[in-house]
Amino acid sequence: MSPVEWKVAVGTETTTAVYEPGTRTSAEVPIFVCAHGAGGNMSDRSMLATVRAFHEHGIGVVRFNFLYKEKGGSRPDSMPLLMQTTAAVVARVREELYPDRLVIGGRSMGGRAASMLAADGFAADGLLLLAYPLHPAGRTA
């Protein structure tokens, strides 16, 4: 199955998400919703390598842009907006795909946003963090 692109509403704005189906069903393995890091976007080399690695194991991945990247910016959105964007993409995944199991996460800042959603009680079957920042940028503790 070919990748499927969606426009996802985030408040009054929209962003792009791409679902790349795996070869195994979500009853066997979860779908992974993967957010990019601060310096990247959903189509950068590290994100595409992540998607390939999951596909080698038959796992479907949804990748998306945060709003600032969708607009071509370089300064990340506020953490509440990053979390809202992630939640909106997950809601769209649930509407479109009805996954049996769903894991949220991402690279660096994207993983941080997903972990903060999970800490707030956001419903997901798992949390996967890649290159997770242990502290905010510019601070060592």
Stretches with model-predicted labels:
Residues T86-A141:
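Primarily recognizes the serine-hydrolase "nucleophile elbow" in alpha/beta-hydrolase
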Residues E5-R101:
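Serine-hydrolase catalytic machinery in alpha/beta-hydrolase-like enzymes
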Residues M1-S2:
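Basic/polar N-terminal segments that are highly enriched at the extreme N-terminus
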